[in-house]
Amino acid sequence: MNMEEQILNDYLLSQGRLQSIISLEQWRQLFPQRYREDPLIERLYEYCTQQRQKRLAKLRANIHLESQVIGKSRIDRMLATNVEKLQTVSHASTLHDVEEFYTSHSAKPLDISEINERLSEAVQSAYTKLNEEKERCTQLTLKMNSQIASLSDFQWSKEPNVDESIHLVESLIESLEKAAPSAIEELD
């Protein structure tokens, strides 16, 4: 814990707990006489204590986070100052050595025409890939639509399995006609 974090904790959290601000007895004195012994008063005090504890926990977390951010910004400022100092170095060889040592790669910088050419190639490559993917998606969509259309029995107002149903009904009627004379004789 750094010094700033310690100061913020001491200043903001020293009287943070509800019990250090007001006791349960003092809390009860805030309410009318007839309600002072009600258990709800004690539950309300406990609830307020819990809420206060949650706020203090958030405050502690924010203090810690802020101290980390402040520490990081100090480091960033120190690095920026060091970079400025390095940029003002008058001796060219020292500056070149420092730049070479601190750069992440030692590639030679490109001129603007090379950069423009490479960017144009990259854009063209991206457009080519995009068009290929669009064509592939179109082909897949057509294939999917044809498969879905072939599965539909209602295409061209055709009812599903109508021929099979008609055949079953006709065979049932024939068997009933054959059985009907014998059934009529049994009823007589």
Swiss-Prot record:
Keyword entries, A-Z: Cell cycle, Cell division, Centromere, Chromosome, Chromosome partition, Cytoplasm, Kinetochore, Nucleus
Pfam families assigned: Cnl2_NKP2
Primary localization class, coarse: cytoplasm
Annotated coiled-coil segments of the chain: none
Subunit organization: Component of the inner kinetochore constitutive centromere-associated network (CCAN) (also known as central kinetochore Sim4 complex in fission yeast), which is composed of at least cnl2, cnp3, cnp20, fta1, fta2, fta3, fta4, fta6, fta7, mal2, mhf1, mhf2, mis6, mis15, mis17, sim4 and wip1.
Function: Component of the kinetochore, a multiprotein complex that assembles on centromeric DNA and attaches chromosomes to spindle microtubules, mediating chromosome segregation and sister chromatid segregation during meiosis and mitosis. Component of the inner kinetochore constitutive centromere-associated network (CCAN), which serves as a structural platform for outer kinetochore assembly.
Protein name: Inner kinetochore subunit cnl2
GO process terms (BP): cell division; chromosome segregation; mitotic sister chromatid segregation
Family classification: Belongs to the NKP2 family.
Subcellular localization(s) per the UniProt record: Cytoplasm; Nucleus; Chromosome, Centromere, Kinetochore
Keyword Isomerase: no
Annotated GO CC locations: condensed chromosome, centromeric region; cytosol; Mis6-Sim4 complex; nucleus
